[in-house]
A protein has these predicted regions:
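N-terminal periplasmic/intermembrane-space "pro-region" immediately following the signal or transit peptide
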Residues: 1-182, 193
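Outer-membrane beta-barrel channel domains
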Residues: 116-127, 158, 181-309, 547
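Short loop/turn motifs that connect adjacent beta-strands in outer-membrane beta-barrel proteins
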Residues: 149-165, 195-205, 247-263, 294-307, ...
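Outer-membrane beta-barrel architecture
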Residues: 153-155, 191-193, 242-244, 288-292, ...
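Signature for the C-terminal beta-barrel architecture of outer-membrane proteins
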Residues: 264, 270-449
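Outer membrane beta-barrel transmembrane domains
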Residues: 340, 349-378, 387-402, 439-532
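Outer-membrane beta-barrel "beta-signal"
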Residues: 542-555
Length: 555
């Protein structure tokens, strides 16, 4: 009786409360019983539902339109109603194409291991990575919250200074026969970078090579004309010193207002590299700025950068030499513009440059010339990666009876096959043809074929022999295969040739052939072992050969 009386009283009270609030509020209760019991109560204004007193059922007054999106909550009011999403007037719905969708991948032979999947994110452990020899301010690759910052350049471009000194030390032993002479030597080279980071976008960088100068390295010859001699070389000159930053970020700091643009800049004694170093690879005194990250739906351009640059000193071009045939790096200026464009599932690079010969006189002057370049890189059918590069030097009219040093064009075609191991096993076949005297814009004595094959590049340390890389009045190719294994080793085998037009040109005495090989192995995270070998057969000239062993220490 007590229970029954209590139940009746509670029901009476609840019915009374419902009548009092019936004009304004409704209480809906949902009890759902399964493994977990869910009790749901919702107080809401009665505007969208009606009550059938006879059945005691809540019903909608109006059925919602079909375009209305619902997120059902268990309540008859469905408060999750949303309006249809708005579409930009420039956008259009696309047609559904069933062929573009496939079933999920199936791996019947692989058992899904939850623990192994978690390790991808949570199983990381620290390792003893190489450290710079000097870290001041805060360490490189540090974790956790950012450290102390300063408002020296403004609250929106915070100063957080960091000084790093890093680089590598190279030492090699080599037996080189360049045809004219045979040398056995032990040589060394030190690359030293000093980087002062100011803000997240601004820094000052300096590069030094203290133990080599003018291609003379710290070395000891144990075979050759200077047998038994030790050459100690010290060079206190700076190889590069420049400022790099972003005008937009600097403006934000100075005005305390966020800028709406990016404008990267650099100036000083600065290095530049374009077209993988084939067109420009040098450090000169000058400046550059870039208009970055542009796009054009109309022309199917997903990303585009345009860079303008100029140099007024230390400009090295093989077209500007003195009477002894040495490059005059202080006698010319360079001005240019280059663009990088991602479009139509490919990559385009194009550029224009002008070398201004500053020399006046009756002997050597007026060696100015224009330089154009363009390239297109794309993968075809998932089987072939291809790059086509063009270089054109024109407009040079030297004074008197001096011979042109930059006038002609070259076309390079680089191909590699996409194998079942596309990142590590790479067969390649690169071809070239050059007419007259094509020249890079700025890159010293190296020719346009530096990256065509390993037979066309030296080592920058021992004077390792190579085939002629000028591509002047010649054609040829380099065919080889590269294997990177598990990315800890590299093996390359290559056959290359240079064929001058008519069997002989002004710069190439005859046909050239070479077999080359390279082995490289990272012994650990600091030491790298590398060996190179070449055997060259030269028409109308002495043959060449070389073998070398190098150890490189990173720090």
């Amino acid at each position: 009786m007590i229970t029954e009386e209590k139940t009746i009283n509670e029901a009476t009270i609840q019915e009374s409360n419902t009548e009092e609030r019936g004009q304004d509020y409704l209480v809906a209760e949902l009890e759902h019983h399964n493994d977990n019991t869910l009790d749901y109560k919702e107080d809401s204004i009665v505007e969208e539902v009606s009550t059938n007193e006879e059945e005691g059922v809540l019903r909608r007054r109006d059925v919602p339109p079909e375009t209305l999106l619902e997120e059902r909550s268990g309540s008859p009011r469905h408060e999750g109603h949303q309006a249809p999403p708005e579409m930009d007037p420039l956008a259009r719905p696309s047609e559904f194409e069933r062929d573009l969708f496939g079933s999920d991948p199936s791996y019947p032979d692989d058992v899904y291991d939850v623990a192994e999947q978690i390790k991808i994110y949570g199983g990381k452990t620290p390792f003893d990575e190489p450290r710079p020899i000097l870290e001041w301010g805060y360490p490189l690759y540090s974790e956790g919250a950012l450290g102390r910052t300063y408002t020296t350049f403004g609250e929106k471009n915070l100063l957080r200074p960091q000084l790093l000194v890093f680089g590598d030390f190279r030492s090699a032993v080599a037996f080189n026969d360049n045809g004219a002479q045979e040398i056995g030597q032990l040589a060394a080279r030190l690359n030293l970078n000093v980087d002062l980071k100011l803000t997240s976008t601004e820094r000052i960088h300096m590069f030094l090579r203290p133990i080599d100068k003018n291609n003379n390295f710290l070395r000891h010859e144990f075979f050759g004309n200077d047998h038994g001699e030790f050459d100690f070389v010290f060079d206190g000159n700076i190889e590069a010193l420049f400022f790099e930053g972003d005008v937009g970020a600097i403006q934000s700091g100075l005005t305390d207002k966020w800028s709406t643009y990016d404008l990267p800049i650099a100036f000083g004694f600065m290095p530049l590299l374009f077209q993988n170093g084939l067109w420009v690879e040098d450090a000169f005194v000058g400046g550059a700025f870039t208009i970055p990250a542009k796009n054009s739906p109309k022309f199917d351009i997903s990303n585009m950068d345009v860079t303008f640059f100029a140099g007024i000193d230390k400009v090295t071009s093989a077209a500007i030499k003195n009477a002894d045939g040495q490059i005059e790096d202080s006698k010319s200026n360079v001005f240019g513009v280059t663009a990088f464009i991602e479009t139509r599932e490919g990559y385009f690079e194009g550029g224009y440059g002008f070398i201004d010969d500053k020399r006046d006189g009756d002997q050597l002057s007026d060696f100015d010339y224009h330089n154009l370049t363009a390239s297109w890189t794309k993968r075809y059918g998932g089987k072939l990666s291809n790059s086509v590069r063009g270089f054109w030097s024109l407009g040079q009219t030297p004074n008197g009876s001096n011979t042109q040093t930059a006038d002609g064009f070259a076309i390079l075609v680089e191909n590699s096959l996409v194998t079942h191991k596309p990142l590590t096993l790479i067969p390649y076949a690169n071809f070239f043809i050059g007419v007259d005297r094509p020249q890079p814009l700025v890159r010293g004595n190296d020719g346009l074929l530096k990256n065509t094959g390993i037979a066309f590049e030296t080592d920058g340390l021992t004077g390792f022999p190579k085939l002629d890389s000028s591509a002047q009045d010649a054609y040829g190719f380099a065919i080889g295969i590269e294997n990177l294994f598990d990315l800890s080793r590299q093996v390359v085998f290559e056959f290359a040739t240079v064929q001058p037009f008519g069997g002989q040109s002004e710069t190439i005495a005859g046909d050239q052939y070479a077999l080359s090989a390279r082995y490289q192995h990272n012994l650990n995270d600091r030491w790298i072992l590398r060996t190179d070998a070449i055997l060259g057969i030269l028409g109308n000239a002495d043959n060449l050969s070389g073998i070398r062993l190098e150890l490189r220490r990173k720090f």
